[in-house]
Every structure is written in C-alpha cells, then in structure tokens.
Amino acid sequence: TCKDAMNMKDFIKSLELSLPELEKMGEIGFAEGMSRVFVNRLNSLDITKRPIHCSDVKREIIHIKDDNKWERDNANLDRLRKIIKQLTHKNILRVDDWKKANPGCTEYNSRKNDQYLRINMEAIGPVDDGEVKRDFGKIIRRVAESTTIDKKYL
C-alpha cells in the first residue's frame, strides 16, 4: 500500500527547479515544461512513496496525500490546481537566480535578453482564463497519466 507515501507539502517543498529546466521551460512553454518537471520528480520516487495517484485517468480521479491522510480531490481538481500554482510560484522565484547566473541578460536586443524574456514569460505561466484552463488541463492530464495506480493500492 501507499501508507509510506510522502505528504504533498513535503514534495512541493523538496521540488527545486534547476536552471537548465527553467531554460527548457522557456523553450517549450509553460504547460510542457511544468508537466515534465512535475512528472519527472514524481517518477523519481518509488510508486508507493508518491504523494499523488490517479485511480481513473479518463475521469481524472486524483488522490492526494497530505497531513498523513489520502483524500480524493474534488471534481474541479481544485487541490491539484493549487499545487500547480504553488509550483509556478517556485518557478518565478528561480528566474532571479537565472538572471544572476547570466549577466548581460538584461541588455536590450541581445540573445540572452530574448532568452530571459521567454523564460520570464513561461515561468509565470498563463494569465488569460482560457490559457489557464488549457495549460492546467494539459498538466493535469499528464500528471494523471503518469500517476495511474491500481485501485487496490488506494
């Protein structure tokens, strides 16, 4: 069973976006970049240690462990959406680290400046309601697909 799974709060706290991952997000976009980071970190954990499981991919039935108990997310997946927002906030904080590691990125009309602007834009994520719905939907689908577990483990 998954009684030894880590709490989601601990998972979020431990997830640190690397500067190369931040650069990749600038290249491939928020939804794809966030999905990769989230899924790769989950996949690095033993399946019984993961703080999130999907029991039905088609219906996107998500179970999240926090405060040492498993709970099913609601139909709107509000908890998972909140987690994505928390991870997005961590991305934004890393942009300043990238800026410090790349002097000259604020010089107008340079390649590094173009890269810096793309990273900034993608790290922040979507702002338009339609884009938020689309991008979060993509991330949720990818997380659900990668965390599918047999119901007997829940």
What are these regions (language model features)?
Residues 1-154:
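Extended amphipathic coiled-coil helices
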